[in-house]
């Protein structure tokens, strides 16, 4: 059924309203023990201050927070009284709301149509972001060590690039291991998924599990793993019989790197990775351009000086190449497209960038643990609301107007309308729908993605058909 824009936004509004009505929040606060008797500061007031009206719950003064609460709801609180309300039950309340939201059906109708969707039901992007917290919280949130931080929070996120649906999520200490979380995510895999993983999540065991479950993967290869290829030139005795020798030989990656030109791609056919545990896979090598090489060297120097991490001599020698392993069929993703497909992973970096630059999730004063956690989960709820709205608008603009939405621009514009959305939720579904229609009109006018330097966008790589503006309107097919 081809619904109108208003009809689709009304269905989206109904799902949102179902989770965030004032009466539901107050009822939930009683069920979770945040409120034990009738009080002026209940679940809706806590949600108001942490989600809707203050994005600096951890850094603004308590006096300022009381002022913002009074301006939004008319509730009068003392700074001491408000600080007491930031307790363990408040954290549990906000954490529960966030958990229900990201597991909800908000993004079920936000998937876009693309050429890749014919082969990959979901494109799963997994990564983590980390930020420092007050040192006195090191017992609860130990950092990653080294000279980088003594206390920190790491947030792990895996989401579907087609729909924006959050698939796996974790808030934990900065020292948490990425690879362990990556393994835990395997239980949510479905046949036909495509997992794109970076080096922090690399595991031969996990990749083998994906292959056995009918799941595709594209991953960077850690350089401490050896690549073997089928012996291309067996040696013979004079009588023509083959000399006894290994069927596979070790690949000299440094030699291979030096034979490639910048920007060139090469595939090692009939290869496997690992000495003890063998993973038979396509191995694709991409030689970085000079610009990419300089960026990598700059990043390595920063990492060594700021985070206390030392790269091995082998890693430094092989800085000029990316080595990818994948089980995607060559006919669907040829070697020339592997690097582009892997670059889809960088979309999650844009999402994490908004968390800090727009939502200030990493900003705090020297405060107690419960208030910091209320800030984090309040920001995560606001982030999810803006993110899910953005993905819905992206789907509508593509389906109805054949346009590509800029994720970063859109999330900023949606955030600007959060307080209007808060006011609408206090009323009814129709009021929420009106705000979303206003947002759609704004994003249609000002939210188009810029096409700079002829770089491929997400839609280009995924094979989405859409219109873009040059000197004249054209239809772009990746």
Swiss-Prot record:
List the SUPFAM superfamilies: Ribonuclease H-like (SSF53098)
Q: Which InterPro entries match?
A: RNaseH-like_sf (IPR012337), Transpos_IS4 (IPR047952), Transposase_11 (IPR002559)
What GO biological process terms are annotated to this protein in UniProt? DNA transposition
What Pfam families does this protein map onto? DDE_Tnp_1
Q: Which UniProt keywords apply?
A: DNA recombination, DNA-binding, Transposable element, Transposition
Cite a single GO MF annotation.
transposase activity
NCBIfam families linked: transpos_IS4_1
Q: What is the recorded function of this protein according to its Swiss-Prot or TrEMBL entry? A: Involved in the transposition of the insertion sequence.
Tell me its family: Belongs to the transposase 11 family.
**What's the name of the protein?**
Transposase for insertion sequence element IS231D
């Amino acid at each position: 059924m081809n619904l109108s824009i208003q009809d689709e936004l009304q269905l989206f509004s109904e799902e949102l309203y179902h989770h965030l009505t004032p009466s539901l929040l107050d009822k939930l606060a009683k069920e979770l023990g945040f409120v034990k008797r009738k009080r002026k500061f209940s679940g809706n007031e806590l949600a108001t201050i942490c989600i809707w009206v203050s994005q600096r719950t951890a850094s603004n003064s308590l006096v300022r927070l009381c002022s913002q609460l009074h301006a939004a709801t008319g509730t009068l609180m003392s700074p001491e009284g408000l600080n007491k309300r930031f307790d363990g039950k408040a954290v549990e309340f906000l954490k529960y709301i966030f958990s229900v939201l990201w597991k909800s059906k908000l993004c079920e109708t936000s998937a876009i149509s693309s050429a890749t969707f014919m082969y990959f039901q979901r494109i799963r992007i997994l990564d983590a972001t980390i930020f420092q917290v007050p040192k006195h919280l090191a017992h609860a949130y130990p950092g990653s060590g080294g000279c980088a931080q003594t206390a920190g929070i790491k947030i792990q996120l895996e989401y579907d690039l087609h729909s924006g649906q959050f698939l796996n999520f974790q808030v934990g200490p900065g020292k948490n291991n990425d690879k362990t979380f990556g393994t835990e995510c395997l239980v949510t895999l479905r046949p036909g998924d495509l997992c794109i993983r970076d080096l922090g999540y690399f595991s031969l065991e996990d990749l083998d599990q994906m292959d056995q479950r009918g799941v595709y993967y594209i991953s960077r290869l850690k350089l401490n793993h050896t690549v073997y290829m089928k012996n291309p030139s067996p040696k013979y005795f004079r009588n023509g019989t083959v000399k006894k020798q290994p069927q596979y030989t070790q690949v000299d990656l440094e030699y291979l790197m030096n034979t490639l030109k910048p920007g060139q791609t090469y595939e090692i056919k009939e290869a496997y990775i690992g000495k003890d545990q063998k993973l038979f896979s396509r191995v694709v090598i991409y030689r970085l351009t000079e610009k990419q090489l300089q960026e990598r060297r700059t990043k390595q120097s920063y990492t060594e000086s700021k985070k206390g991490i030392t790269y091995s001599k082998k890693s430094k020698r092989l800085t000029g190449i990316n080595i990818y392993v994948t089980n995607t069929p060559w006919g669907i993703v040829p070697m020339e497209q592997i690097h582009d497909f892997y670059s889809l992973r960088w979309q999650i970096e844009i999402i994490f960038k908004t968390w800090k630059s727009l939502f200030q999730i990493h900003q705090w004063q020297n405060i107690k643990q419960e208030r910091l956690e209320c800030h984090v989960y309040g920001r995560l709820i606001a982030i999810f609301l803006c993110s899910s709205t953005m993905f819905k608008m992206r789907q509508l603009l593509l389906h109805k107007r054949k346009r590509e939405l800029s994720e970063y621009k859109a999330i900023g514009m949606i955030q600007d309308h959060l307080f209007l959305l808060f006011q609408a939720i206090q009323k009814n579904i129709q009021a929420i729908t009106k705000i979303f229609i206003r947002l759609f009109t704004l994003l249609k006018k000002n939210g188009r993605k810029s096409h700079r330097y002829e770089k491929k966008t997400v839609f280009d790589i995924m094979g989405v058909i859409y219109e873009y503006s040059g000197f004249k309107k054209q239809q772009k097919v990746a």
